[in-house]
Amino acid sequence: MNVILTHHAGVERIDRIANCLALFGMNEFILEIKESSRLFRLTDTGILFVFDETGSVLITGYMATPEKVASMYKRAGYAQVPRNTWSVITRNSRTYRMKF
């Protein structure tokens, strides 16, 4: 996947994105929702990437919060967050919330 980084992602937030990838890794996107002109893509390891509406420009990336993930699943039409995903998100939040 070829992605262009915005100045924000490539300069201002690159350390945060790199730390998330180093701590959590990244296997695959498990959920994608569109909000206004942005695509929010959640990975199975709990990283949330924000892209432009085409999905080719990365705006930012960060550790997903339980609140954001619950909101995303609700917007996608799910009654609740899948158990495995919720476990990952809440564990990350408890363990790493002060690091980011």
What are these regions (language model features)?
Residues 1-100:
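Ribonuclease/tRNase effector modules and their secretory precursors
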